[in-house]
Amino acid sequence: MSNIKDKVVIITGASSGIGEAAAKELASKGAKLVLAARREERLQKLQGEIEQSGGTAIYKVTDVTSQAQMEELAAYALKEFGKIDVLVNNAGIMPQAFLFKKMVDEWDQMIDVNIKGVLYAIAAVLPSMREQKSGHIINLSSVAGHNIYPGGTVYCGTKHAVRAISEGLRQEEAMSGTNIRVTNVSPGAVSSELLDTTSDAESKAGLNEFYKIAIDADSIARAITFAIEQPSDVAINEMIIRPTVQVG
C-alpha cells in the first residue's frame, strides 16, 4: 500500500505547472487533495479531472499573499478532512530584469509571493501539524536558490530565502521532536507558465532560449511523490532536479 494513500495534501499554485502535475500524481496514489490557486476555472477543471480518474480533490480560490486567505485554506482542509498531512508550497513567480531597470513593483510582487506566501502557508499549517505530531512541508525553491545570474538577482534572492526558511524550519521542528519533515525542492528549467511572469523583453528572450531544454513538470511531481513516500523516520531534505543537459 502506498504511504500516500489517504494523506491530506494542500497544494498552492495548483492551477498549472508543477502544482497541477503534483496534484494529478498524488491523486493517482490515493492522496486527498486540497487545491489552491487564484484561477477558479483552472481549479474546477483540475478537480473534475482528478475525480473522473477516481481521485479525491476539493479546492479553494486562494491568494498566497493574503495571510487571512492562507489561514482560511488551512481551516477549510481541516473542516473537510480533519487533518493536514502535507503542504506543497508551490506558488511562485519569476519576473527577470537587470536591477538598473528598477522594476520595483515586480520586486515587491516577488517578495510577496515567493517569500511571504511561503511563510504564510507554513504558518497556516504548522499548528495542526505540531498538534498531531506529524506532517510534511515541501517548499519549492529553484536552482536559482543555489546560483546567482545577471538579470535574476531579485528572483535568486527570493529562492535563496526559501532554502533558508526550509532549513531553519527543519532544524526547529527536529529539535522540537514534532516529527514534521521538511523538504526543499529546487527545479531547474521546467516547462510551465512561469516564463509568462517575466515582462522585460530582453530577459524574456534569454529565458525563452534557455528554456528550450526544459523538462516536463511531471518530473518534479515524481520527485515530490518520492519524498512523501518515504517512511516517517526518513526525511529527504533537499532535492535539485535539472534537465540532464542544463549546466548552471
Model segments located where?
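Conserved glycine-rich Rossmann-like NAD(P)H-binding loop of the short-chain dehydrogenase/reductase
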Residues: 29-46
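Active-site helix of classical SDR
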Residues: 122, 158
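Residue(s) in the substrate-gating loop at a strand-loop-helix junction
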Residues: 142
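C-terminal helical subdomain
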Residues: 180, 184-185, 203-248
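Conserved glycine-rich cofactor-binding loop
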Residues: 8, 15-16
